[in-house]
């Protein structure tokens, strides 16, 4: 009985694998495409190899695009795997006058609830930016709030 179940399970797994492979080959629509400086399409590994070389990397984004936020998160994870404690992050989604609050949260001196209450977080922070900050916190990656304070930006 167990052999029959195992055989059927393996057969089903094989069929699913073939189906997934076929889907990936034909009907798959990518969420993004990467290009190098010459406009040639490149893969993610090539991107990370290029981004791992310079001392500073700037990533532009559309603030309400969850795909770019996810890609930033994945790039951060990949660069951390290469650089470990040499990595430092900065993000425009946090204003410079929130640096103390951010530092307190990152060092676990205050809770997430207090951080959320005191920092002026963007509406999409919890869905688009929190995973990025949480990854930095868990891995003790220094994080700089790089945006100009709102009171000056609104002048």
Across the structure, where does each feature detected by a protein language model lie?
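Solvent-exposed loop/turn segments at secondary-structure junctions
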Residues: 62-66, 94-98, 149-153
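Short internal beta-strands
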Residues: 87-95
